[in-house]
């Protein structure tokens, strides 16, 4: 595990958070769902790209909680450091960083990797089991009240 990733995880425990937490299980759920979506839709996107993006997409959460920087902005900056140590092409690195920056947007204008991560991020949540669901700020349309995947 990359040292920067480990350090971010330690800083972002979310022990007092009553809503969905950003855990390794969440990151892997997002990765698996995004990969399933790509296969179902016939989208040609390497699995490694999807998994790397999903594992890093919320890495800026600790900075958001402590400094107030939006986690997508902070995450892209932090991920850039991690990606410099990984064996991806410059185009692949830019695709990952772009998807991290844009993973909160449901727009059709963003690249397909961003769309996959956005949808998987939302679908990964089990709102139907959550005791905090009534207080959640998500709109009813975003909440997952049934099992789909």
Please provide the spans of the model-predicted regions:
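Short coil-to-beta-strand
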Residues: 6-7, 47-52
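Single conserved hydrophobic/aromatic residue that forms the stacking wall/gate
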Residues: 1-12
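Helix-centric, low-specificity signal for extended rod-like, repetitive segments
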Residues: 2-3, 50, 97
């Amino acid at each position: 595990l990359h040292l920067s990733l480990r350090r971010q995880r330690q800083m972002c425990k979310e022990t007092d958070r009553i809503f969905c937490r950003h855990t390794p299980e969440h990151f892997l759920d997002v990765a698996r769902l995004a990969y399933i979506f790509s296969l179902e839709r016939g989208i040609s996107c390497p699995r490694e790209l999807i998994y790397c993006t999903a594992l890093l997409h919320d890495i800026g959460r600790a900075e958001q909680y402590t400094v107030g920087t939006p986690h997508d902005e902070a995450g892209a900056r932090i991920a850039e450091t991690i990606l410099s140590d990984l064996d991806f092409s410059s185009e692949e690195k830019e695709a990952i960083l772009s998807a991290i920056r844009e993973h909160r947007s449901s727009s059709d204008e963003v690249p397909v990797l961003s769309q996959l991560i956005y949808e998987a991020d939302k679908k990964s949540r089990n709102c139907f089991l959550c005791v905090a669901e009534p207080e959640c700020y998500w709109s009813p349309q975003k909440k997952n009240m049934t099992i789909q995947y």
